[in-house]
């Protein structure tokens, strides 16, 4: 085994008082490190998204990685998965604006969207120069920012047209580009 990708989702898990899903990352990590202890062999572990919803569990996971001496990383696994459509920005390209649309929530879906976009944008001229600024818009503030031109309406439309999850806003109308009011009914909790 050259490495372990820990993904603990796609199940029906309860939420805590902060609204976080109680994904069993810690429990999966304990099973992984149990194998490491039993075999005496380790491999780098990449934890999809964050380590845990609980600081003490996250700290224990980190401490265990230090104790057993294996590389331990966390973030989105999406930058290394296949893309639909299969696209990469050419190395050294000039990039003026980038946008990513995602249908997932803010307990992991946000990091997936941001890191998937960053993985593609870092191919731009200047390379891995980081993120200069990030603004979050939620609910009505999202639609207000859209109306105010906080991002390119053409880029927004291009992203929306590539969606594999866009349902017709009106029954019986397939491949119909929704109006702003229809978008609001399709996206109950938008954020950008």
Task: Provide a role label for each language-model segment.
Residues 1-44, 57-60, 66-68, 122-133, ...:
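N-terminal glycine-/serine-/threonine-rich beta1-alpha1-beta2 phosphate-ribose binding loop
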Residues 39-121:
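A contiguous active-site-proximal alpha/beta segment in oxidoreductase catalytic domains
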């Amino acid at each position: 085994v050259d490495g372990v990708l820990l993904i603990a989702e796609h199940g029906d898990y309860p939420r805590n008082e902060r609204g976080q899903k109680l994904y069993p990352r810690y429990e999966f990590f304990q099973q992984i490190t149990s194998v490491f202890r039993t075999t005496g062999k380790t491999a780098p572990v990449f934890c999809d998204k964050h380590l845990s919803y609980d600081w003490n569990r996250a700290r224990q996971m980190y401490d265990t990685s230090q104790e057993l001496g294996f590389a331990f990383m966390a973030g989105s696994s999406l930058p290394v998965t296949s893309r639909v459509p299969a696209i990469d920005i050419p190395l050294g390209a000039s990039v003026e604006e980038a946008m990513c649309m995602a249908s997932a929530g803010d307990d992991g879906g946000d990091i997936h969207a941001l890191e998937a976009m960053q993985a593609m944008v870092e191919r731009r001229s200047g390379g891995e120069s980081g993120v200069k600024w990030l603004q979050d818009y939620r609910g009505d503030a999202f639609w207000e920012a859209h109306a105010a031109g906080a991002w390119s309406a053409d880029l927004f439309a291009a992203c929306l047209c590539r969606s594999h999850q866009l349902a017709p806003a009106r029954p019986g109308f397939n491949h119909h580009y929704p109006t702003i009011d229809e978008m609001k009914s399709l996206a109950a909790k938008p954020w950008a």
